[in-house]
Amino acid sequence: MLGAGLLSAPLFAAEPARPGTVNYIEGAAFLDGRPLNNRNIGNLAMDAGDELSTATGKAEILLTPGIYLRIDSNSAVKMVAPDLELTQVEVDHGRVGVEVDQIFPQNNVRIVDAGVETQLVKTGYYEFDANHPEAQVFHGRAEVEVGDGKYEPIKNHHELALEQGAHLKTVNFVARGTGDDLYNWSSLRSQYLAEANNQIAGDYAYGAGFNPGWYWDPYAYDYTFIGMNPFYSPFGWGFYPWGGFYGAGFYGRGFYGHGYYGGGFHGGAGFSGGVHGGGFAGGGGFHGGGGFGGGHGR
């Protein structure tokens, strides 16, 4: 519940991240009907049964390391299981997007829409619409539970209607243009997270005992994912564990072909001293799908 998930706001670092941690909000967002603000970012995590909703706003929560769930305006999600072994979120109404930058076979990440469970299997970008129940795979692979222990796979650029009585067959869809606000916002968030990665990765990755996982950026004021090796997000933004990134893109729209190398927020804040002097040691590492490691020094 809210009281159990609300953590004290430290001066320099957020609490260690776990599935359900609120990573970003803009506009009107609520947890179990209580309004959220920027002080909750990184310091508030959803427990089982909690509902996060938006009005004229948006929100982003962390799932397992490397997976972000983004909640569109006028939407709501309920946390079913905030565990590393089973991470399950139900879309009550509205739309959500899920960016998967890292996933292991040991992970079991599921999105429930209209009572139907969809398991995310590969890295990529996914959207779910509870108002018109459907699962869309822009890039990646998902498996929809259709009953009797059977699953219907959804591949790149395919969607599946999730309403009862609908045809259990995926259909190809044409990726929507830049008018898709949720997609474009997710791409922008991915860009900002890549900038945060570029900003702090060198300070963390060169430290002793580095493990890939969630790491707190005190300047962007959110968690970003630092992996063991370089990778691209589904939107083409490069994440490099030793700093530096550039963009590519899958869909030829949004931010295709743009990006940065050596950009971000370097220069004005004396970051290296802030990290080490402020006790930013270790991190939210993730080992082979089994759990978090390390921790945030304070």
Residue ranges with predicted function:
Residues 1, 27, 230:
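Residue-level marker of positions within ordered structural domains that often coincide
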Residues 1-8:
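Bacterial N-terminal signal peptides
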Residues 11-203:
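Flexible, surface-exposed loop/linker segments and immediately adjacent secondary-structure boundaries
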Residues 171-277:
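Low-complexity segments
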Residues 265-298:
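Extracytoplasmic low-complexity, disordered linker/stalk tracts in cell-surface/secreted proteins
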